[in-house]
A protein has these predicted regions:
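Eukaryotic N-terminal targeting leaders
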Residues: 1-61, 65-74, 87-104, 138, ...
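Leucine-rich solenoid repeat modules
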Residues: 4-6, 18-24, 34-37, 46-51, ...
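Hydrophobic regular-secondary-structure patch
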Residues: 36-132, 154-159, 184, 313, ...
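Conserved beta-strand positions
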Residues: 52, 85, 114, 151-154, ...
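Acidic-and-aromatic substrate-binding clefts and catalytic sites of carbohydrate-active enzymes
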Residues: 83-95, 158-162, 184-189, 250-252, ...
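Well-ordered, non-membrane alpha-helical segments in soluble/globular domains
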Residues: 92-96, 126-139, 221-229, 285-289, ...
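Leucine-rich repeat
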Residues: 119-344
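Ligand-binding grooves and catalytic loops that recognize ribose/phosphate and carbohydrate rings
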Residues: 193, 197-238, 352-404, 408-409
């Protein structure tokens, strides 16, 4: 969805703290004692809001708001600016609260995502009536409780069956300019009210990944209706974000050839999942030139994600001056060769298909030209005969500016020391590391020890996520995890070693170890 604060640059924390010092006698204004709380209340409200708006972690914003009742009331617009209801229980509890107990909170919501019956955990949950969810949102909108809503996304098991949801949001939420929905096994209604919006800034349509037994219910030739394209191409000239996504696991393949007809001067974010650019009357070769012209006509693009299907153009061939603002790219290994803006790309994702050792060596040659790269997500599939240390060392040496690495290895088990040794010998200073790998079933690792060893090897590490499975996998979004560990690296102990804490969640989704946010470390 489109960010309302895209134009803002982060305000340095040091500047915020210096402003706080001018208004309070106690530098440690956010500690938990009552005297500090009194000093905190003397800090100007606009400075507190500035701090909260520039904290990326929602839990830290909550911790800051819990400093005092005064601060909590001040930060309500920040706390509720973006609401993502990620489960049926969250949908039910939050919507009932907004309808009955706290109707005042709805006026702060600018971005709302509802995910009834979302399969996020392995624990069985009672199905939630999605019609009730839709009608609850209709009641909120018609009663004027969502006046500032700018972005709405529906992620249920099926598109809303009652079209009044979309017509009500369009009528009662004058600031709403970004909408989206997922699609279940039923066909898309061409006359849906979802396609009646005008002047959109963002639009999202995703296909639900369905169980195999549901495939028989899929339409034989699922098509995107003309009404959708008319809304986007003819009536949304100021479109900034477009996402049409189909999972690799889905047998549904949408024809997205008409996207090349769009001309959106403000388009910043384009994401095309595993869709097709070659229908019955055309081929992949015939679509390469129109699609390259389309990309060249959108110089404001900052984020681009392309699919991996054989029916989509495999190579990118663009003039040297094209895509000058591109900073984030996701696609195939073959795609990155033709990108005209390699030295300025900061985020790269190569997770559509696993890379062999031979293909990785080719990719590393390209990575060496990406001097600004700080975030890399990559999926490797190496055989048992591979020199894993050499592979990891070559990868790390090819992108020495990395601060975030998300590495998935779906081959036979390898020794962890091969990765830690490569990391120790490199110049990479990682801040976050996500590692997904296959492990022997008879050798379940101690993830805390692994995280501690990684933090010792790379002192800059602050967050480590470790995932392992006993079997290989075909798709990254369907890995049969045996265990997942999330770790935070705190300050060093007196002995010099890192203090690594596992991040565990209670039912309320708050961390066991978290305390009210303190800014004393910046002062």
């Amino acid at each position: 969805m489109v960010s309302s604060k895209h134009w803002q640059s982060p305000l340095p924390m040091s500047l915020l703290v210096s402003l706080i010092k001018q208004h309070t006698g106690d530098w440690r204004v956010f500690s938990s004692n009552s005297q500090s709380n009194q000093n905190t209340c003397r800090v100007p409200l606009d400075i507190i809001i500035e701090i909260a708006e520039r904290i990326n972690n929602r839990e830290d914003i909550l911790s800051l708001s819990l400093t005092s009742a005064h601060i909590h009331a001040t930060l309500l617009p920040v706390l509720y600016a973006s609401v993502d209801l990620r489960s049926s229980r969250m949908c039910k509890n939050t919507l009932e609260m907004l309808l009955n107990r706290r109707p005042d909170l709805g006026r702060h919501i600018r971005r709302l995502v509802v995910r009834p019956n979302h399969r996020q955990s392995q624990q069985p949950t009672k199905p939630l009536d999605e019609d009730w969810v839709a009608q609850s949102i209709v009641k909120l909108a018609t009663s004027g409780r969502l006046p500032r809503l700018t972005s709405f996304f529906w992620d249920g098991s099926e598109m809303p069956q009652d079209d009044t949801l979309w017509s009500t949001l369009r009528t009662c939420c004058p600031e709403l300019r970004s909408v989206g929905s997922n699609v279940g096994p039923k066909s898309i209604k061409p006359d849906s009210q979802l396609f009646r919006f005008d002047d959109l800034a963002g639009f999202t349509l995703t296909a639900k990944t369905l169980p195999d037994e549901w495939d028989t219910f899929l339409p034989p030739e699922p098509e995107l209706p003309d009404q959708l394209w008319d809304m986007l191409i003819e009536r949304s000239k100021r479109l900034e974000q477009l996402r049409i996504d189909v999972s690799q696991r889905s047998r549904r393949v949408w024809d997205t050839r008409r996207v090349v007809q769009g001309r959106w001067p403000q388009l910043r974010d384009l994401e095309l999942g595993d869709c097709s650019m070659a229908g019955n009357g055309s081929s992949r070769i015939q679509m390469e030139t129109p699609f390259m012209r389309f990309l060249a006509a959108h110089p404001e693009l900052e984020r681009l994600r392309l699919p991996s299907l054989s029916s989509f153009p495999r190579a990118i061939i663009l003039p040297h001056a094209s895509l000058p603002n591109l900073r984030e790219f996701s696609g195939n290994a073959a795609h990155i060769k033709g990108l005209p803006n390699l030295p300025r790309i900061k985020t790269l994702s190569l997770t559509h298909q696993p890379l062999s050792e031979k293909m990785l060596s080719v990719v590393c040659g390209t990575l060496k030209h990406m001097k600004s790269l700080t975030s890399l997500s990559i999926w490797l599939h190496l055989d048992a005969q591979s020199d894993h240390y050499a592979v990891f060392r070559n990868l790390l040496d090819s992108c020495r500016g990395l601060t975030h690495l998300d590495l998935a290895c779906s081959e036979a088990p390898w020794e962890m020391i091969e990765f830690t040794s490569a990391l120790r010998g490199s110049r990479v200073e990682l801040v976050t590391l996500n590692l997904t790998r296959v492990e022997r079933s008879a050798n379940e690792p101690d993830l805390h020890k692994v995280a501690t060893r990684l933090a010792t090897t790379n002192p800059s590490l602050r967050k480590v996520t470790l995932r392992y499975s006993f079997t290989t996998w075909v798709f990254l979004d369907s890995i049969p995890y045996q265990r997942v560990g999330n770790f935070i690296v705190k300050d060093r102990s007196k002995q010099g070693g890192p203090v690594v804490l596992e991040k565990r969640y209670k039912s309320s989704r708050r961390c066991f170890y978290r305390r009210p946010l303190s800014l004393s470390k910046y002062i």
